């Protein structure tokens, strides 16, 4: 057959051929001598050839006289032969249909069963039955013969109906017997040939008896197993008088048999279930009852299901060398087994034919001979079934037609592409195995000579075992990839590889075969056999094992692992021999043990765990919370709780109670109770106080006992069937802050009173309630308000309830009344009774946070002695909850110590805790609340709802949105966005974009058009990184928008000098490791116009500086010359020419408000470097002269921009009226910075990108790199540009600054300790504002602002206040080991900012002296005054920064 033409070559594609069975053979039961037909019929356009198999062997029907093939394909067997030693016809038959050009298919297997010789295993016997009862006559035969059994009554055939019923076994049931049922019965087997008769037996019908007869089962139901669709019969024959009535239940529910289609009663009580289904499985109960009694009998019904297909194999197209999978899903009961057949022959699993996922067939490395029909044959105990599919292998140049989803593995037709005419690629070059392991090999190669770039080439790697002609294929995952990993190989096996390149025209030449052998697999030891563990004592276990049977090399040692059951942590110990005894274990505790053997290659296979429990011992602790309650005059009830968990040391078998009279401590009585937690001690004396203690027992003995606890029996047996009566009297005596309450008991002394309840409150007695002992007769209510009206109520109570209250009121005395002495209390007779007041709540509750899920609660108990030792049976209850969500319920736990470890809490969650104490039946109120917040934990869930959208109008810009993790476990401090074009790439190969934690959206720019990108997001808190989100795919649009040119220019001009670098607010730094910025910088001016402006400003500035410098130099006084000459004589001979050609323009101190230019002292350096400090007005003023450092800026510039928060900065606004503004040569900055000094060890550290939400991240200390390294107007030669970026950060070396700090008259500090670099923040502030900055005033006019001044010895300069410059001077490229910089803002600061002393310019009255001749020097007294003035200015600025 031919089908549609291939879209690749136009050749005709063969279609699948319908080929299947119309009728398949079924199981047959036959008898000797009968004829049998096994039906079989198949369909195919080409008439198939039919053959038959018996027991897996083809039958030769040509020479067989008894078997013949009918025209429709059925098999006829004439005169079935069957004897004891010759059974040629019985067996399993299978029909095989073959079409020569296609293949073969086989039918299901059918069983032919031949009934055996007729014989009876039991025969009818004489029996009698009462009229109306049911009778049964046995005739047991083989199961095969049961269908051939019939019955005769008085030698006449017996007709069967619902009352007279034949069981499947052949027995006869007669229900509701009548007189006509009496007679002689026999059963007959008619299985062909002469019938075989059983013996005759008489059935007698008896009249009803005069007395009732007991019910008895004549035949009970027995459990059955049936196949779906069969009938099931549960016989149930009961006899007795009166005649019993039989009914049935299924799984305890009444079974309705009337009007049911499938359930019916036969012969008076037997249950018939027709067409059994799986829903019929269960327990069936036959219930027979009459007026006198009821009897029951049960039986189970199990149902088996033949195999059924849930998923049938599908037809598959494939190419040679591909891997395919035929899927087959079956069900049945018992679970079916599956085998596969190809063209009628069973498929034997091998390296290339594998059974995967239980039932599926995987064929690896297809070859042409694999074509044909594949059948999945499922079989269980009750049947079999088959389903098939066709495999067609196409030529490599023929594309696989589009079909419903077929089961192809990863090696599909991805290597095929629509073929066009053109040159094909040559063979790939230099195919080598770069990594060879035991089960995988990595291959790499070079592109073909015909296509050296190879960007559009894909590759197919064909490989096979050496000596086997079945090749498999693996394709590269993306175009241009020149390596592949071949996995699932066999160890120590030689494989042959070849690589074929493919372009849009088709497959090219194959590379030369490459033979590679996989590594042999390391032979590790197997599991140690016969591992055994037995407990030697309550705290030790001995483990033994034998030497592993497998392994390569000598066993070096063993490692024994053991773990307490229910715990997560496993412990281990190294063992040299074959046994070990572990000590120090817990008593009567289950432990699991396993052993791992080690050889020179490492650990082997672990043994299975063996579990053993340590031996029991006497309990190690006493029972808890023993309470006593007098029941009457002769008995006391004891209640207690078991010893604490972990102290039982075995199974508690009982409790030993010891008690004695308090007056006779030597006379002790013992009572042994069971495992219950209470005991009533009877036979006690009236009105006598007894001591009790209790101890727990195990089979090993008795553990420690509790402390003695006392209780007193009643004087007389009182009534506790009703509540007590009202107390006979109530008296109150108010004091200033307390009221003394006294009372007398109820007049009726015959009712039990177990205590009194006192209620009180201002205006109402229900505010507070106190319960006291029944012996108490007075109580002082404390902590009341003076001059307040209190209502007091008193009620007696017992176990039935509270009695009638008695009310009284009192007004506490005012504060002025100091008479607090109550004569009534003093003179009242003392009664030694237990403390009647309620227990005081614990105090000093504290919550100590230990981890992210654990908090330790501690408290104190004021009712204990000062040493806080617990000597009684009190216990504490700890409760805790969190208020999020609001309706959270309290959780509680009990403790017998003064601390408790609360575990299982949520990270970063605020909990509240309170404690109460309980002693016997008395409990305190809850203590005051303590709070604690658990520590943070790394996020345990990824950010959610990650979405990616394209920015409108900018197809190369995308916007990533997300939501915080549902389990953040702390404050999210940042996110990291990973993106890549290869979802399978290693994570370290993905591009990252850090984002601050308060942002849930981020833009990524300069992406490639029409390219799929994959995005993942990872959240971070103070504890670390959380898990990554699932990859989200987004394909960028195909079309380019109108802003393409600015984007392209921005990314393409880096390093070419075509336009100045734009450092405006829109500047976005590049990705880490990328040379092109993912941003869209734009310039408000045309690049040519901007260049002209920059050059003009630079020239004008140089001219002005030169003129001012010459003017200042000529006014230097001769006295200054003498001073400098004296300094030179000490430091060495430094000649300094005063020629005009050597004069450099001095740095100028610019008073922004006074608009004055003040020269600073001249530097002694031989080659001083000039630095201008103009006043920037807006962000446009700081455009650099040249953008040759463009690429460096891209690499170094920090993208962290934004407005600083007010609370993170000190303010200088309050001092602006007193101090002149000090400007920096950079872009506009926030008006109120904090200036702090930080040592920066390296300026080339890789920096991360941060979002522009705020100036500084509280969790990072990344360097803020300088934006514009050049002041406006500074002229630079081409030779200076090479190190332009670095020179701004570098400190002058010793070559350019020969006057080092070791010189006594030097005017500058050591470069390593004093030099600084200004690191600019980003620019997003208002352009009209300027940054107030600080300058250090040097002592020489030509010295740069970068070099701080050091006062001469003996000056008033304070050395404890460091002077930090804000701008370094330019210097040639020299290595700098350490640079100290002054940074703006709170950049990663973890401590208060260091005080910075910044001297200001001198006052106006000093102008004349400063403008004298440059060769002059200060007088000593003038220097002293100047230094004192500088010191005052530095202290002022220090006060400002610390404020």
From Swiss-Prot:
UniProt entry keywords in alphabetical sequence: Cell adhesion, Cell membrane, Disulfide bond, Glycoprotein, Immunoglobulin domain, Membrane, Repeat, Transmembrane, Transmembrane helix
Pfam families: fn3, I-set, Ig_2, Neogenin_C
Chain intervals with Polar residues compositional bias: 1072-1082, 1176-1191, 1284-1304
Domain Fibronectin type-III: from-to ranges: 427-521, 527-617, 622-716, 726-816, 841-937, 942-1039
Chief location of this protein within or outside the cell: membrane
Topology, Extracellular side: 1-1090
Location of the protein in the cell: Cell membrane
Disulfide bonds: 40-95, 139-187, 236-286, 328-376
Stretches of the chain found on the membrane's Cytoplasmic side: 1112-1443
Keyword Repeat part of the UniProt annotation: yes
Recorded GO CC terms: cell surface; plasma membrane
Keyword hit for DNA repair: no
Family stated for the protein in its record: Belongs to the immunoglobulin superfamily. DCC family.
Summary of the function given for this chain in its UniProt record: May be involved as a regulatory protein in the transition of undifferentiated proliferating cells to their differentiated state. May also function as a cell adhesion molecule in a broad spectrum of embryonic and adult tissues.
Matching PANTHER family: NEOGENIN, PROTEIN SIDEKICK
Name this polypeptide is given: Neogenin
């Amino acid at each position: 057959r031919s089908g549609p033409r291939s879209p690749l070559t136009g050749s005709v594609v063969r279609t699948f051929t319908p080929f299947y069975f119309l009728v398949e053979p079924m199981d047959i039961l036959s008898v000797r001598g009968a004829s049998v037909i096994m039906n079989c019929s198949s369909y195919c356009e080409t008439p198939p050839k039919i053959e038959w198999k018996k027991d897996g062997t083809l039958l030769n029907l040509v020479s067989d006289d008894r078997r013949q093939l009918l025209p429709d394909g059925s098999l006829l067997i004439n005169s079935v032969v069957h004897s004891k030693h010759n059974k040629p016809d019985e067996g399993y038959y299978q029909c095989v249909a073959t079409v020569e050009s296609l293949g073969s298919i086989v039918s299901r297997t059918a069983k032919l069963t031949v009934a055996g010789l007729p014989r009876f295993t039991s025969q009818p016997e004489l029996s009698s039955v009462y009229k109306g009862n049911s009778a049964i006559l046995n005739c047991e035969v083989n199961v095969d013969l049961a269908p051939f059994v019939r019955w005769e009554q008085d030698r006449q055939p017996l007709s069967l109906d619902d009352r007279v019923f034949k069981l499947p076994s052949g027995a006869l049931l007669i229900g509701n017997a009548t007189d006509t049922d009496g007679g002689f019965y026999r059963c007959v087997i008619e299985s062909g040939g002469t019938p075989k008769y059983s013996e005759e037996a008489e059935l007698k019908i008896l009249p009803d008896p005069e007395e009732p007869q007991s019910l008895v089962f004549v035949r009970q139901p027995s459990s059955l197993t049936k196949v779906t669709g069969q009938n099931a019969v549960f016989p149930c024959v009961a006899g007795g008088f009166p005649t019993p009535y039989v009914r049935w239940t299924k799984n305890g529910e009444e079974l309705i048999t009337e009007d049911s289609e499938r359930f019916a009663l036969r012969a008076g009580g037997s249950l018939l279930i027709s067409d059994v289904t799986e829903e019929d499985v269960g327990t069936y109960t036959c219930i027979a009852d009459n007026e006198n009694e009821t009897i029951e009998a049960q039986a189970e019904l199990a149902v088996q299901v033949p195999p059924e297909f849930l998923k049938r194999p599908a037809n598959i197209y494939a190419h040679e060398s591909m891997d395919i999978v035929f899927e087959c899903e079956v069900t049945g009961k018992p679970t079916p087994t599956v085998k596969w057949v190809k063209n009628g022959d069973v498929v034997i699993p091998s390296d290339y034919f594998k059974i995967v996922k239980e039932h599926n067939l995987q064929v690896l490395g297809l070859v042409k001979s694999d074509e044909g029909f594949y059948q999945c044959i499922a079989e269980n105990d009750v049947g079999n079934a088959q389903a098939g599919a066709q495999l067609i292998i196409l030529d490599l140049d023929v594309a696989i037609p589009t079909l419903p989803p077929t089961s192809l593995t990863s090696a599909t037709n991805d290597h095929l592409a629509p073929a066009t005419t053109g040159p094909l690629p040559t063979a790939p070059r230099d195919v080598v195995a770069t990594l060879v392991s035991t089960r995988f090999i990595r291959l790499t190669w070079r592109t073909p000579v015909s296509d050296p770039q190879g960007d559009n080439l894909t590759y197919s790697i064909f490989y096979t075992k050496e000596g086997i002609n079945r090749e498999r294929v693996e394709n590269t995952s993306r175009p241009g990839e020149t390596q592949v990993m071949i996995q699932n190989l066999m160890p120590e096996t030689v494989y042959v590889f070849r690589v074929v390149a493919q372009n849009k025209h088709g497959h090219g030449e194959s590379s030369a075969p490459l033979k590679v052998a996989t590594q042999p697999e390391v032979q590790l030891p197997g599991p140690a056999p016969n591992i055994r563990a037995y407990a030697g004592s309550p705290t030790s276990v001995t483990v033994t094992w034998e030497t592993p049977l497998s392994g390569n090399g000598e066993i070096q040692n063993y490692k024994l692992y053991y773990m307490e059951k229910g715990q997560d942590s496993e412990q281990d110990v190294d063992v040299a021999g074959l046994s070990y005894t572990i000590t120090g274990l817990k008593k009567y505790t289950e432990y699991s043990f396993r052993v791992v053997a080690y050889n020179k290659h490492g650990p082997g296979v672990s043994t299975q765990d063996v579990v053993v429990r340590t031996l029991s011992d006497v309990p190690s602790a006493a029972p808890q919370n023993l309470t006593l309650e007098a029941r009457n005059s002769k008995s006391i009830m004891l209640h207690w709780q078991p010893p604490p968990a972990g102290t039982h040391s075995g199974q508690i078998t009982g409790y030993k109670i010891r008690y004695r009279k308090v007056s006779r401590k030597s006379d002790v009585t013992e009572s042994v109770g069971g495992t219950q937690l209470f005991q009533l001690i009877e036979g006690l004396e009236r009105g006598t106080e007894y001591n009790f203690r209790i101890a727990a027992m195990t089979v090993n003995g008795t553990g420690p006992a509790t402390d003695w606890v006392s209780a007193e029996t009643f004087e007389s047996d009182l009534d506790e069937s009703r509540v007590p009566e009202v107390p006979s009297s109530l008296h109150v005596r108010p004091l200033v802050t307390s009221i003394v309450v006294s009372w007398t008991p109820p007049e009726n002394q015959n009712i039990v009173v177990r205590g009194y309840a006192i209620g009180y409150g201002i205006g109402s007695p229900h505010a507070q309630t106190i319960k006291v002992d029944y012996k108490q007769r007075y109580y002082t209510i404390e902590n009341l308000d003076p001059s307040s009206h209190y209502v007091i109520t008193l009620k007696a109570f017992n176990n039935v309830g509270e009695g009638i209250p008695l009310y009284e009121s009192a007004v506490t005395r005012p504060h002025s009344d100091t008479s607090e002495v109550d004569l009534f209390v003093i003179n009242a007779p003392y009664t030694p009774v237990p403390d009647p007041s309620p227990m005081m709540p614990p105090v000093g509750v504290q919550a100590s946070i230990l981890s992210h899920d654990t908090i330790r609660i501690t408290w104190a108990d004021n009712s204990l002695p000062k040493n806080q030792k617990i000597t009684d049976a009190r216990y504490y209850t700890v409760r805790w909850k969190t208020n999020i969500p609001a309706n959270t319920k309290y959780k509680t736990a009990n403790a017998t110590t003064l601390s408790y470890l609360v575990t299982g809490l949520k990270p970063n969650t605020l909990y509240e805790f309170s404690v109460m104490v309980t002693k016997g039946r008395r409990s305190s109120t809850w203590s005051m609340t303590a709070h604690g917040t658990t520590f943070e934990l790394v996020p345990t869930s990824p950010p959610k709802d990650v979405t990616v959208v394209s920015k409108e109008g900018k197809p190369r810009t995308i916007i990533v949105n997300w939501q915080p993790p549902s389990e953040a476990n702390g404050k999210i401090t940042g996110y990291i966005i990973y993106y890549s074009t290869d979802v399978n790439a290693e994570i370290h190969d993905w591009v990252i974009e850090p984002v601050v934690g308060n942002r849930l959206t981020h833009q990524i720019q300069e992406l490639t058009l029409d390219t799929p990108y994959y995005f993942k997001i990872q959240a971070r808190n103070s504890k670390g990184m959380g898990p990554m989100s699932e990859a989200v795919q987004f394909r960028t649009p195909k079309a380019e928008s109108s802003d393409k040119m600015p984007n392209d220019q921005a990314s393409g001009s880096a390093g070419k000098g075509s336009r100045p670098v734009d450092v405006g607010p829109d500047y976005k730094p590049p990705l880490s490791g990328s040379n092109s910025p993912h941003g869209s910088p734009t310039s408000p001016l045309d690049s040519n116009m901007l260049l002209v402006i920059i050059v003009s400003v630079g020239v004008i500035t140089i001219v002005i500086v030169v003129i001012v410098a010459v003017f200042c130099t000529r006014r230097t006084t001769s006295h200054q010359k003498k001073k400098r000459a004296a300094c030179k004589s000490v430091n060495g001979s430094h000649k300094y020419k005063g020629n005009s050609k050597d004069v450099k323009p001095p740095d100028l101190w610019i008073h922004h408000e006074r608009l004055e230019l003040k020269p600073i002292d001249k530097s002694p350096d031989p080659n001083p470097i000039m630095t201008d400090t103009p006043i920037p007005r807006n962000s446009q003023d700081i455009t650099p002269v040249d953008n040759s450092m463009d690429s460096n800026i891209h690499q170094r510039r920090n993208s962290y921009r934004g407005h600083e928060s007010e609370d993170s900065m000190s303010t200088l606004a309050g001092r602006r009226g007193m101090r002149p503004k000090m400007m920096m040569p950079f872009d506009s900055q926030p008006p109120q910075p904090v200036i702090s000094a930080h040592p920066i060890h390296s300026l080339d550290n890789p920096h991360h990108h941060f979002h522009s939400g705020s100036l500084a991240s509280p969790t990072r200390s990344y360097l803020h790199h300088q934006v514009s390294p050049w002041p406006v107007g500074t002229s630079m030669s081409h030779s200076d540009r090479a190190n332009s970026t670095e020179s701004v950060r570098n400190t002058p070396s010793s070559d350019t600054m020969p006057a080092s700090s070791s010189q006594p008259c030097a005017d500058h500090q050591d470069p390593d300790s004093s030099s600084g670099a200004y690191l600019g923040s980003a620019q997003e502030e208002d352009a009209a504002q300027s940054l107030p900055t600080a300058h250090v005033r040097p002592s020489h006019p030509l010295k740069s602002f970068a070099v701080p001044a050091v006062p001469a010895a003996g000056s008033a300069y304070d050395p404890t206040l460091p002077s930090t410059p804000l701008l370094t001077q330019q210097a040639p490229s020299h290595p700098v080991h350490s640079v100290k910089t002054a940074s703006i803002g709170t950049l990663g600061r973890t401590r208060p900012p260091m005080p910075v002393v910044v001297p200001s310019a001198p006052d106006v009255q000093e102008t004349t002296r400063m403008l004298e001749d440059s060769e002059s020097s200060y007088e000593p007294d003038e220097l002293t005054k100047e230094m004192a003035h500088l010191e005052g200015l530095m202290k002022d600025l220090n006060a400002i920064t610390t404020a």
